[in-house]
Amino acid sequence: DALAGVGHACGHNLLGTAVAAAACALKADMEATGAAGTIRVYGCPAEEIMSGKIVMNDQGVFNDLDVAITWHPFDRNRVSNDIWQAQDIKNYTFHGLSSHAAKAPEKGRSALDAAELMNVGVNYLREHVPGDVRMHYAYIDNGLPANVVPDIAKTNYFIRSYLRSRTEDASERVDNCARGAALMTDTTVDIELVASCSEMKVNRVLTELYYDAMTQVPTPTYTPEELDFAKQITEEAGLINDGTLFSGLEPLEDEP
């Protein structure tokens, strides 16, 4: 995940193992059938922080590939026919002027005030963007102790929607919130575009090919010990476990 702490536990720990196993299985099949070709396994780091595959693609890593196949863990067996969101990842760094918060606050220019005002502006902006737009933020540096006017503050933003054009529009408006906050607080702001990607397009032919292949693969079976372990996990997490287990292959959606 390349996230601090636990992260968000969406199963990225399974990616490398399954991809390596799939590559070995495909190699064995190619050797058995006499098929020609080269298989490569890529590790794509920092997906959650900077959309690692986008950076790798921009640097030409995948230029000579005929096809690239990816997968993601899920809570059931399915083939995705979804359109995944276009996204901008940005860092906003506000620069102010440090001063003692009790002795001479009037001499300070709070970078943290600017960051907070930016976030207030973005939260008011939510009413005026399309319903599929998402704008998430976190503080990644808020400067000095409370008795010092902070001269630096940093926020990290993820801005998403299902269309690149909407993402770009929302992203520019978030930038304007940052610029306005800097103007109000007599600070400055640096805007860093960490990564940017367009929405994922659906290829119906490949989707159906995947689905047909998955119908030929036996679905997993679990031992009583494994089911008991799963129940313990859900209880520890405070989740509801009604004892049922999804099995089989989820039907393919007609439309993305």
Predicted regions and their residues:
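Residues that form or flank phosphate/diphosphate-binding pockets in enzymes
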Residues: T17, S51-G52, A102, S165, ...
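Flexible, small-residue-rich helix->loop connector segments that border functional cores
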Residues: A21-A36
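Inter-helical turn/loop segments and adjacent helix faces that build the functional surface
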Residues: D29, T33, A101-P105, R164-D169, ...
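Cytochrome P450 catalytic-core helices
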Residues: G16-A21, A25, M56, Y210
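Histidine/acidic-residue-rich, glycine-tolerant segments that coordinate divalent metal ions
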Residues: L3-G7, N13-L14, A32-P150
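Internal helix-loop-helix
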Residues: G7-H8, A23
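Metal-dependent amide/peptide-bond hydrolase catalytic core
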Residues: L112, E116-P256
